[in-house]
Design a protein with these regions (language model features):
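Short, glycine-/small- and polar/acidic-enriched structural segments
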Residues: 1-54, 59-62
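A generic structural-conservation signal
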Residues: 2, 62, 84, 108, ...
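Structured segments of extracytoplasmic/periplasmic soluble domains
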Residues: 4, 10-14, 18, 43, ...
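Pocket-lining segment of extracytoplasmic ligand-binding domains
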Residues: 5-7, 14-17, 46, 82-174, ...
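Extracytoplasmic/secreted envelope proteins and their assembly/folding machinery
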Residues: 27, 50, 68-75, 92, ...
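N-terminal targeting leader peptides, primarily classical Sec-type signal peptides for secretion
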Residues: 48, 76, 238-241
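Ligand-binding clefts/hinges and TM-proximal coupling segments of bilobed small-molecule sensing domains
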Residues: 57, 63-73, 146-218
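An extracytoplasmic/periplasmic, membrane-proximal ligand-sensing/linker region
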Residues: 94, 101, 111-129, 139-146, ...
Length: 241
């Protein structure tokens, strides 16, 4: 199945949304696919930094969702608690409409960039993308190994003239630990041997690479996937060590 790389880490460790159910180790990583970018945006030109969110109404995604925990990580790194803002638990579409209607001041979205909701708002009303960088980003990267640095290129959204610094998790494929090695090997080969063909049909396919597949993964790889990567000169962890 498909999962954010941070969410699979929560499941493996039995934390956050998986605290009640406890840790589960019955799955393995096949590989990372593309960036699920943490995007913080506003229509208010006076909100320029994460710290400027204090006292503001901010959409942080549905409670216990991947977006919610990503937003918490950013806020916490900026010294902001939920008591310091007016949190709103909205979907991407509702975040867009609430910004447009002036009901919220800023929103977090975690998805591949460009994201339709942000593109639509940038086209009709204009948006400001807020950088997640400096000490805040350094703190997050230090504490949470499933995040990596990311730069949203200039021109990704209408009116976005400068690149935006942020962080990302990855859309990841996981498989059952009991799936046989040959099947997982063939699945891995089917994706990465045909990356160019996939990219011709879907823009996110341009991010498919063996480097993206194997970096930022905190959960052990399936032996079948590991065999494929080894044939291409990449050694991955299959034991959780």
């Amino acid at each position: 199945g498909f999962v954010q790389s941070d969410v699979m880490a929560y499941a493996w460790d039995g934390v956050r949304a998986f605290e009640q159910d406890g840790a589960t180790h019955d799955f393995r990583t096949l590989g990372g696919l593309y960036a699920e970018t943490v995007q913080l945006f506003t229509m208010d030109p006076d909100i320029k930094t994460v710290e400027d969110l204090k006292g503001k109404s901010v959409s942080i995604g549905a409670a216990n969702s991947g977006v919610y925990f990503n937003a918490l990580d950013v806020l916490n790194a900026g010294g902001i608690t939920l008591d310091d803002i007016h949190p709103q638990y909205l979907s991407f579409e509702d975040s867009k409409e609430s910004l447009k209607d002036g009901k919220i001041d800023a929103a977090f979205i975690v998805a591949g960039a460009p994201t339709t909701a942000i593109t639509e708002l940038a086209t009709t009303n204009g948006v400001y993308m807020i950088n997640i960088d400096g000490a805040i980003r350094d703190s997050i990267l230090s504490d949470c190994p499933y995040y990596t640095s990311y730069q949203i290129p200039a021109g990704t959204y209408p009116g976005q003239d400068e690149p935006v610094e942020t962080i990302t998790v990855k859309a990841t494929i996981v498989v059952s630990e009991n799936l046989d090695d040959d099947t997982v090997y063939d699945m891995t080969a089917a994706i990465f041997d045909h990356a160019d063909e996939i990219a011709s049909e879907n823009a996110k396919g341009e991010e498919l690479s063996l480097e993206n597949a194997t970096t930022g993964m905190t959960i052990p790889f399936h032996e079948g996937a590991a065999r494929y990567y080894a044939e291409h000169g990449i050694t991955v962890d299959t034991k959780g060590e």
